[in-house]
């Protein structure tokens, strides 16, 4: 099974991805997490350091794939999760999609791409150009991380449009939304009313989630010394269980940006009195 995790920049995708990866490993699955961001910090909370990227390794070996070994690019993270960072082209040059393609090519050359029960792509920000939408070409499911904010949901709609486009050519489905660090969900529910899709989980505004990123640890690792965090880990285990059940998922509805902008902004500004629907926009 292959998963692609997207969401607005800074929404907590990498923290969420790392904890989902550990949760899947706790369920007995062999998991590989692939960071698809030039910052190459996707797997930081799994490994505790910034691991070398595949692009760095290939450049050091003059792109001689035959000289690269699995241990050169695959690092063991917390909970037995294997970690890879694709890296990226120099700032202002090149294409991130090319980097993702080279990463998958190398892992296939190493016979590693098919050795895992679950491969999770953690993809940079809310960029949904053809390049950074590339992981959707390999994914069975897309997961979108959001919060209860207007901007994050607007970004989610753009990502949903990419899923819809990719689903034309292969059996990709949107597994659903994950609300991250939010005590409210009214705007999320308004969005899902307009664009029907599952809400896999909504994690409350828990400071330890943010702190875990700074510490370079997953919530599961932190829970070893602070058992009160086991309740937080249960959120990620619930997400893992839903994914492993191979949900039907959805091909998202086509909602024009302007219509959704009007709907969400109206509800955001007037949450009590708004009865507006997309049909009225």
Swiss-Prot record:
Gene3D superfamilies: P-loop containing nucleotide triphosphate hydrolases
Superkingdom of the source species: Bacteria
GO MF term set: 4 iron, 4 sulfur cluster binding; ATP binding; metal ion binding; oxidoreductase activity, acting on iron-sulfur proteins as donors; oxidoreductase activity, acting on the CH-CH group of donors, iron-sulfur protein as acceptor
Cofactor note: Binds 1 [4Fe-4S] cluster per dimer.
Tagged with keyword Magnesium: yes
Pfam families: Fer4_NifH
Cofactor: [4Fe-4S] cluster
Family of this protein: Belongs to the NifH/BchL/ChlL family.
Protein name: Light-independent protochlorophyllide reductase iron-sulfur ATP-binding protein
Annotated source species: Thermosynechococcus vestitus (strain NIES-2133 / IAM M-273 / BP-1)
Name of the gene: chlL
């Amino acid at each position: 099974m292959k998963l692609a995790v997207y969401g607005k920049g800074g929404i907590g995708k990498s923290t969420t991805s790392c904890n989902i990866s550990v949760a899947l490993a706790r369920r007995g699955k062999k998991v590989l997490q692939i960071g698809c961001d030039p910052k190459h910090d996707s797997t930081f909370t799994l490994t505790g350091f910034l691991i070398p990227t595949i692009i760095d390794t290939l450049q050091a070996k003059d792109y001689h794939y035959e000289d690269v070994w699995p241990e050169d690019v695959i690092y063991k993270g917390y909970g037995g999760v294997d970690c890879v960072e694709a890296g990226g082209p120099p700032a202002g040059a090149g294409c991130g999609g090319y980097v993702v393609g080279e990463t998958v090519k190398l892992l296939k050359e190493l016979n590693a791409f098919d050795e895992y029960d679950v491969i999770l792509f953690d993809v940079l920000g809310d960029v949904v150009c053809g390049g950074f939408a590339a992981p959707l070409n390999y994914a069975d499911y897309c997961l979108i991380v959001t919060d209860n904010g207007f901007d994050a949901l607007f970004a989610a709609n753009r990502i949903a449009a990419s899923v819809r486009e990719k689903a034309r050519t292969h059996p990709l489905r949107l597994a659903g939304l994950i609300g991250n660090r939010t005590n409210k969900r009214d705007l999320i529910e308004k969005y899902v009313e307009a664009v029907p899709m599952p809400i896999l989980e909504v994690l409350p505004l828990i400071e330890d989630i943010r702190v875990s990123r700074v510490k370079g640890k997953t919530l599961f690792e932190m829970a070893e010394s602070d058992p009160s965090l086991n309740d937080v880990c249960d959120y990620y285990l619930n997400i893992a269980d839903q994914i492993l059940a191979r949900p039907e998922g959805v091909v998202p509805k086509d909602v024009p940006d302007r219509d959704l902008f009007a709907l969400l902004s109206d509800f955001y500004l007037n949450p009590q009195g708004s009865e507006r629907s997309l049909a009225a926009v």
